[in-house]
Amino acid sequence: MKRFWACLCLCCCLCAAPLWSFAAAPAGNTGTYEVTELWTGDVLTASFRMGMCFAADGKLRGVVLLRSSNGQVDVYHVYGSVQNNTFSATHGSGHKITGRFLPGDDVEVKIRLGNGMRFTTVARRFRDVPLTDDCAPLPETSTHQQD
């Protein structure tokens, strides 16, 4: 019986990877339309740029570029959902981003790291911006730069 459950768990894990790949497919490949946004802001001594793609069914996917004070850039691909005025997205490492859309061009972003540390910040929101196929922000030399 233990072997059965182990095999079942292994099959579920192997089957989950293609599902995430399909969810992360570019909007043009799936035939669905996505709204794109760029969020920029600071948290502690780092700055971030988030490319976010929202589908009509409430799914979101995005890429977070976190630039530390020494210039190193870490990249995080996140997946989640939007409902009403709130959103939630997770990274495979256990990091979680939640928050709400504020009036105007701001979004409240709450970050919970996999180790439990929490941060809250307000990001500036740019709507209908070009992003890469995987929703990553374009290089900072493009038209939407962080202020």
Regions found by a protein language model. Give the residues of each.
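Positively charged n-region of N-terminal signal peptides that target proteins for export
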Residues: 1-4
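General helical structural elements
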Residues: 6-7, 129
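Bacterial N-terminal signal peptides
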Residues: 7-17
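Boundary at the C-terminal end of the N-terminal hydrophobic targeting segment
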Residues: 16, 21-26
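Central antiparallel beta-sheet cores of small beta-barrel/beta-sandwich binding domains
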Residues: 24-102, 108-146
